[in-house]
Structure formats: C-alpha cells, structure tokens
C-alpha cells in the first residue's frame, strides 16, 4: 500500500509544473496560445478588485478610497492562475494601448450606446459652426467677374431692328385660304409643252409612245440606194431591164467609196463606154468593186480584145 501511495503522489502534477516559467518570452509569431489546464480567464470589475484588495490587505492597512469614478473606466484584463511576471507584462501592454488611444485625436465622432440600447451621437459644439461658416465665406470671396457688354448695345449702328407690330397675326383659316389659292393657280396653267413619257399616256390609243428603232448604218443606207436604182432602171425599160456588171478594169473601178471602203453602185454612161451600146436598148452596166485594191493585169476584157491590158500575160486563172 505504501508503494502504491508513493506512485500516486509522484504522478500527480504540482502547481509549479503547470505554471510556465518566467524565462519564456512572448512573441507575435506564436501561433498557438493555448493555456495550460486549470487557467481561468476572467474580467474583473473595479468593485471586485477593490473587494479583493480589501481581503488581501491586513486589518492595520488604511481603507482604500472609494472608486466611484472608476465605474465608467474600461474594465482591466486579468488572468488568474498565471505567474506575477506574466500578469505585469500583460498589464503593461494594455496600459500602453490605452494611453495611445487617449493621445490619438478623434477624427470622427464616435457613437455611444445609451442605457436603453439605442445609439446616440455626441452633439457638436456650437462654437465651431460659425467659425467654419465664416472661413468658407472669406475663402469664397474674390474678384467679381464683370459681364461683357453686348455689341448691339455698344454699337447699335451695326444692327438693324425689325419689328412685327404692323404685321397682322395669321390664323389657321388664312393659311388654308392662301394654300388653296396657290393650288388653284397652279392647276390653271396649261400643259401644252408637256410630253408624257413611256406608258404615261392616259388614252387607250397610245399616242405619244416612245418607239425604239435600231440606228441605220452606212452599209444599210447604200443597200437602200441600190434598191432605188434598180427600181428606177426597171421602170425606164418597161419593167424588163437587166442589170449587168461593168468591166472591173474600167476607170470607174479605181474609185473608192469614201474612207470606209464599202462597195458602191456605179452606173457608167454610154459616152464613156461606147462598146456597151451594142447591147439591147435599156440595158445599163452596173459595176461593183470591193475595198481591196486589185491589179488590172489579172483581168481580161469582156469582148476578148487582144490589145487589152491583160493580153500579154494571158488569161489569169
């Protein structure tokens, strides 16, 4: 039994083991600030502190003065079960914070909580309000800006004044009458020089339509002249006249038809070609020539004259 009791006494932790040593320093880098078992954190009111102080003090010590003014002060932070050195350090830290808070100027009015739980703002002193108002008034004062004088006031000769006093006020009825009179005068204007465009003629006969025609070329005009000449020759011979080709090597063969070289119809007279008079009466030779120039040596005379221009070389194939 004695051995068992001795073992139990050795296993029980003592108060010195639970308290941290004074040499251990506190730092901001400590992440785990867990307190050992048995340590209680309490917030002591000033009344409780005074009661504890009276209990700790002896009967011979004089009583402490009443602390009625400390009721509104901030309740100090106190840890029970810690060493005296740690308690002094904590008190010194919080005292420094409180002194720094007192020295800092109040930039904004702080709200306080009344007894019924509603927030109330402190009333600003009335002495500061007129001073700020006067400072703003004095700060805004400056040289007044003079507005420029208008030009029509300083130089009235440059401006012309118009007045509508002599003009009668127009009504809606007068405007309507003026518009109708203008439209009636426009409708009475004759449209003699008006030519309706395509598909704008109101009549059913289609007068004034635009007819599109193909432009006439020079070759078509010459062909038309050929037909007119044929009709004239036929009517002079009694309707049975024949058209013969004149000799291509004649003097009329070298005549060219303008600058474009189109073929032309040439009707030689009997005085120029006496040999053509041997034919039937009313027969006229018609010569055709192209735009390409040909040599006379390659052509043979119609009547087979050996003294012709092509008799020396013989007939051309």
Swiss-Prot record:
Annotated Acidic residues bias: 1-19
InterPro entries: TSSC4
GO cellular component, one term: nucleus
Protein's UniProt keywords contain Acetylation: yes
Keywords: Acetylation, Cytoplasm, mRNA processing, mRNA splicing, Nucleus, Phosphoprotein, Spliceosome
Ranges where the record places region Hom2: 74-101
Compositional bias (Polar residues): 108-117
Region of interest called Interaction with SNRNP200, as start-end residue ranges on this chain: 146-300
Residues with Phosphothreonine modification: 124
Chain spans, region Disordered: 1-74, 101-152, 216-317
Modified sites of kind N6-acetyllysine: 214
Composition-biased stretches (Low complexity): 20-37, 240-250
GO aspect biological process, one term: spliceosomal tri-snRNP complex assembly
Domain of life: Eukaryota
Protein family according to the UniProt entry: Belongs to the TSSC4 family.
Role noted for this protein: Protein associated with the U5 snRNP, during its maturation and its post-splicing recycling and which is required for spliceosomal tri-snRNP complex assembly in the nucleus. Has a molecular sequestering activity and transiently hinders SNRNP200 binding sites for constitutive splicing factors that intervene later during the assembly of the spliceosome and splicing. Together with its molecular sequestering activity, may also function as a molecular adapter and placeholder, coordinating the assembly of the U5 snRNP and its association with the U4/U6 di-snRNP.
Protein name: U5 small nuclear ribonucleoprotein TSSC4
High-level lineage: Eukaryota, Metazoa, Chordata, Craniata, Vertebrata
């Amino acid at each position: 039994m004695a051995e068992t009791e001795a073992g139990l006494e050795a296993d029980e932790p003592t108060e010195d083991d639970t308290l941290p040593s004074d040499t251990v320093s506190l730092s901001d880098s400590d992440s785990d600030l867990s307190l050992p078992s048995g340590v209680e954190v309490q917030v002591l009111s000033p009344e409780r502190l005074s009661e504890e102080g009276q209990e700790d003090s002896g009967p011979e010590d004089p009583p402490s003065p009443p602390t009625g003014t400390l009721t509104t002060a901030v309740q100090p932070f106190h840890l029970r079960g810690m060493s005296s050195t740690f308690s002094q350090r904590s008190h010194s830290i919080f005292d420094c914070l409180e002194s720094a808070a007192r020295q800092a100027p109040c930039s904004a009015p702080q709200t306080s909580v009344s007894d019924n739980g509603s927030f109330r703002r402190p009333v600003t002193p009335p002495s500061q309000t007129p001073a700020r108002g006067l400072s703003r008034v004095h700060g805004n004062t400056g040289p007044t800006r003079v507005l420029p004088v208008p030009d029509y006031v300083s130089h009235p000769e440059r401006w012309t004044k118009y007045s509508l006093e002599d003009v009668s006020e127009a009504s809606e009825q007068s405007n309507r009458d003026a518009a109708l009179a203008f439209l009636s005068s426009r409708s009475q204007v004759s449209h003699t020089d008006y030519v309706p465009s395509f598909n704008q003629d109101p009549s059913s006969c289609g007068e004034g339509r635009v007819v599109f025609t193909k432009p006439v070329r020079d070759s078509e005009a010459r062909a038309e002249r050929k037909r007119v000449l044929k009709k004239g020759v036929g009517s002079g011979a009694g309707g049975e006249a024949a058209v013969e080709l004149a000799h291509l090597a004649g003097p009329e063969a070298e005549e060219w038809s303008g600058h474009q070289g189109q073929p032309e119809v040439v009707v030689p007279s009997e005085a120029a070609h006496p040999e053509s008079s041997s034919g039937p009466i009313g027969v006229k030779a018609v010569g055709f020539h192209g735009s390409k120039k040909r040599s006379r040596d390659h052509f043979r005379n119609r009547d087979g004259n050996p003294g012709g221009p092509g008799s020396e070389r013989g007939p051309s194939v």
